[in-house]
Amino acid sequence: MERATQPRPRALLLLFLLLGCAAGISAVARARSLLAPTSDTAFGLGAAAAPTSAARVPAVATAEVTVEDAEALPAASGEQESRATESDDDVELRPRGRSLVIISTLDGRIAALDAENHGKKQWDLDVGSGSLVSSSLSKPEVFGNKMIIPSLDGDLFQWDRDRESMEAVPFTVESLLESSYKFGDDVVLVGGKSLTTYGLSAYSGKLRYICSALGCRRWDSDEMEEEEDILLLQRTQKTVRAVGPRSGSEKWNFSVGHFELRYIPDMETRAGFIESTFKLGGNKEDSKIISDVEEQDVDTVIKVSVADWKVMAFSKKGGRLEWEYQFCTPIASAWLVRDGKVIPISLFDDTSYTANEEVLEDEEDIVEAARGATENSVYLGMYRGQLYLQSSVRVSEKFPTRPKALESVNGESAIIPLPTIKWKPLIHSPSRTPVLVGSDEFDKCLSNDKYSHEEYSNGALSILQYPYDNGYYLPYYKRERNKRSTQITVRFLDSPHYSKNIRKKDPILLLHWWKEIFGTILLCIVATTFIVRRLFHPQPHRQRKESETQCQTESKYDSVSADNSDNSWNDIKHSGYVSRYLTDFEPIQCMGRGGFGVVFEAKNKVDDCNYAIKRIRLPNRELAREKVMREVKALAKLEHPGIVRYFNAWLETPPEKWQEEMDEIWLKDESTDWPLSSPSPMDAPSVKIRQMDPFSTKEQIEVIAPSPERSRSFSVGISCGRTSSSESQFSPLEFSGTDCGDNSDSEDAAHNLQDSCLTDCDMEDGTVDGDDEGHSFELCPSEASPYTRSREGTSSSIVFEDSGCDNASSKEDPRMNRLHNGHHYVNKLTEFKHSSSRSSSEATLSTSPTRPTTLSLDFTRNTVDRLQPSSPKVYLYIQMQLCRKENLKDWMNRRCSMEDREHRVCLHIFLQIAEAVQFLHSKGLMHRDLKPSNIFFTMDDVVKVGDFGLVTAMDQDEEEQTVLTPMPAYATHTGQVGTKLYMSPEQIHGNNYSHKVDIFSLGLILFELLYPFSTQMERVRTLTDVRNLKFPPLFTQKYPQEHMMVQDMLSPSPMERPEATDIIENAVFENLEFPGKTVLRQRSRSLSSSGTKHSRQPSSTFSPLPGN
């Protein structure tokens, strides 16, 4: 018995030893599992997913699988480097686990494929949170030609149909929500960002819990093992909705989301893992590359075709397709779970793997090529009729990620260079038709999708209409980025925390634009040279001959030197003088020259009405100035419907030569409104005033018609005088028609025409000749009709029936007086006529410098007087009522037959003129220069008497006889000037005269109204005969009453002429009824608008002048 019981303690000891060994082995295995290498996991965005985390996976015999990932994070790369230093034994002892390919699709589902079992689907789970993308931004009615396309990672892109380019918007969904709740006056933004975490069984796909802002929900199941590995999915969804603030109706919306994956081994929940291990998906600069040690063992590559919705596995060495899986929904993200690590799969790796070793020397180049393809890819796809974008990591890095992109600080702006993606779409396969092998399932997916390609055509781009096109790759070319860089200015918060996210502007290469740059520089040089030459280097003016005159009012034509042409606008601007005329008025155009000044049309800057501004240069003597001012004050008080209204007057004393320089600048700037019309030197007639008996009182006018020969001329001689004095002979005037060759014999060159254009001169026509082409006007006109000139087309029809130019020069230049007296002047005239063939030249009326025309009067000016310093010039500006350019002279020239002139209308016009003259006489004034060219029409066709340059008081003292530079032998009244053809005999003879001189002029105007002329020669002859009371028989027979009245008005004796009141009450006007006759005499100032808006058309009221 003792022997039998002895071995029992030994058996117990052996049993204890066996149990201890088993426990030791179990502890060692447990310790090994705890010492296995691990790494943290961070979440990525879409295709750019997170780095890996290591965990123990049950050892399963499987082939080596690897994924080329150009977008893995650097942290994981560092881990691989550390692991590469491990011993080979440690590498062999590492446990191998199952390989799963986790796929996230746009419909919100998660699927797992078994990489070792030919891609068989391990599990498929719908978490019930809806699709990842939903938007109404692609509809054309939202943004028109431009639209906003969201990206799955939260970036926004703007598509421009016109430019066919896509640009990144400088803010994300988060910054759009955080910047302001109000997007515009009619849009309010609402929405937010939601984070949801899902816990899944790694290999069964069963949902264990869901955690969100509302709390966590768990599914307890006995089937779930405690040690089963967990896949941690985190879904980020961002939603923005735009609603109307009043109605609450939704205008547009979009929502984008993405999944992030992490692998949790065993039961370790690691409290606080979100703070310690999760990284922002926006950190896109990390990447992971498999170490060289592992690359020696791998032989399979997992690739994702975004366009075909496929996941494929290739043999790395042979490039053979091992397996593929077709999804029915676009793929958003993909991961490979192997050996306890999560490796993101690039969706944009389009590298071809082939067995050809010559193409790429080693496997390292393959990785670099895959990385290059990944960098420059953007995919534009469509899901359920909604466009969306998937961008690679390298392209996404170039997009701004500031959350406060729309906010501003201190009004400062920051410039962000945004990448522009050109519309150069690349289809995903060389052939637009799908490959036959394996395409049946894909066709089935298309047929089952209710959002077919007919629905896709409703999208904004209308590009995905081919049945097998689901999207396009948009390469991001570096050379295009270097050529052009789109810059969008946005405002940022001045925070140093964000300074590291700003990318510097890429260098712009200008070599591609060398032609445009060269052309722009050349154009700038030419334009600058032209402007400088025109403004600062004007052409030198031609100087006027000393013996030459052109209706000059002021002594403006002094010696003109080349230095004057160098004066620029800067000299005038810096002179310090401010003109009231230029301050209060805006000049429009020059309307012409009156008896004493220049008339401008100008617009008042305050009331916006147009007025006629007359500029008169006052005489140098104080007595003369007082007289002119007294006359202006008297005229300003005249208020009558038949008189041009005066509104305002002021004096200006500009610096020396300031006004001349301003006039020259006006000429250059307003050249279209200042053309000159003149007879051609070949066609210009000559007007010869022959020397007659100085004691003869008979007026003689001889008209010689121009001959067709080259040198043709006609002469008009007007000789008049007084029996009491031989010094009163009328000034002779001679014009000679010569060619341009005769002009070369002249001693002096012709003066610049432009310089004379703004001279205050005494011309017979005070208005611009409206019938001449280009609104031209005459510098030294006659009574020749502008209508006739335009009708005949030549200047040979111009007739100078008076010597207005002579008088104009005489009345304005006192130095001429010494040369106009007695026989001295007759002797000078004789010498002039003997040498006329040598020294005569044509009037400078043409703008052509090669055919000058000069008005030759052999009046020598004293050089000493010319060099004497002149006193400051004083100008009187008078603001008057603006009338039409057409005066009574133009009105009659357009009606050359009696049928064209209605008798009633002519009498109506004359009656209005007579009433205006009667009003003047009642105020103790006389006009002294009544003629058709001084009778105007307002915009509403009311007759107005104007041009009161020669108006004077009827009781003027004799000592004031020369205050306005009278002619040499005339001893009464201002200047003794006026148009000779309409002057009374006492004016021409230089005798004392009264207001009856206006009655004489009225008689000639009435005769000319009732008796039209076909030619100007006929007009000159007939009016000359009528002045001597020789009336045409037709006029006597047809108008007997008018004949008697005209005969009385033209009586040689002023005492026998009727008063203006008697004329108005004549029986001729009592037998006829005029439209508005009674209204005319009671017409107030309001019936004729004082100022008129800028309009050249007559009013629509009743016009007493038919055919105007």
UniProtKB/Swiss-Prot annotation:
Upregulating conditions: By ER stress.
Ranges of the Lumenal topological domain: 28-506
Any single GO CC term annotated in Swiss-Prot or TrEMBL for this entry: nucleus
Positions of modified residues (Phosphothreonine): 794, 974
Compositional bias of kind Low complexity: 837-856
SMART domains in the record: S_TKc
InterPro entries from the UniProt entry: CC_SR_Kinase (IPR050339), Kinase-like_dom_sf (IPR011009), Prot_kinase_dom (IPR000719), Quinoprotein_ADH-like_sf (IPR011047), Ser/Thr_kinase_AS (IPR008271), WD40/YVTN_repeat-like_dom_sf (IPR015943)
EC id: 2.7.11.1, 2.7.10.2
The keyword Transmembrane is annotated on this UniProt entry: yes
Cytoplasmic side: 528-1108
Topology in membrane: Single-pass type I membrane protein
Main location: endoplasmic reticulum
Signal peptide from the UniProt entry: 1-27
Residues at the active site: 929
Compositional bias segments (type: Polar residues): 785-798, 1097-1108
GO-annotated biological processes: angiogenesis; bone mineralization; calcium-mediated signaling; cellular response to amino acid starvation; cellular response to cold; cellular response to glucose starvation; chondrocyte development; endocrine pancreas development
Superkingdom of this protein's organism: Eukaryota
Glycosylated position list: 253
Family the entry assigns: Belongs to the protein kinase superfamily. Ser/Thr protein kinase family. GCN2 subfamily.
Function: Metabolic-stress sensing protein kinase that phosphorylates the alpha subunit of eukaryotic translation initiation factor 2 (EIF2S1/eIF-2-alpha) in response to various stress, such as unfolded protein response (UPR). Key effector of the integrated stress response (ISR) to unfolded proteins: EIF2AK3/PERK specifically recognizes and binds misfolded proteins, leading to its activation and EIF2S1/eIF-2-alpha phosphorylation.
Domain notes: The lumenal domain senses perturbations in protein folding in the ER, probably through reversible interaction with HSPA5/BIP. The insert loop specifically recongnizes and binds EIF2S1/eIF-2-alpha.
Quaternary structure, from the entry: Forms dimers with HSPA5/BIP in resting cells. Homotetramerizes in response to endoplasmic reticulum (ER) stress, leading to its activation. Interacts with HSP90B1/GRP94. Interacts with DNAJC3; inhibiting EIF2AK3/PERK activity. Interacts with ATAD3A; ATAD3A and EIF2S1/eIF-2-alpha occupy a common binding site within the cytoplasmic loop of EIF2AK3/PERK, leading to prevent EIF2AK3/PERK association with its substrate EIF2S1/eIF-2-alpha. Interacts with MFN2. Interacts with TMEM33. Interacts with PDIA6. Interacts with LACC1.
Protein name: Eukaryotic translation initiation factor 2-alpha kinase 3
Species assigned in the record: Rattus norvegicus
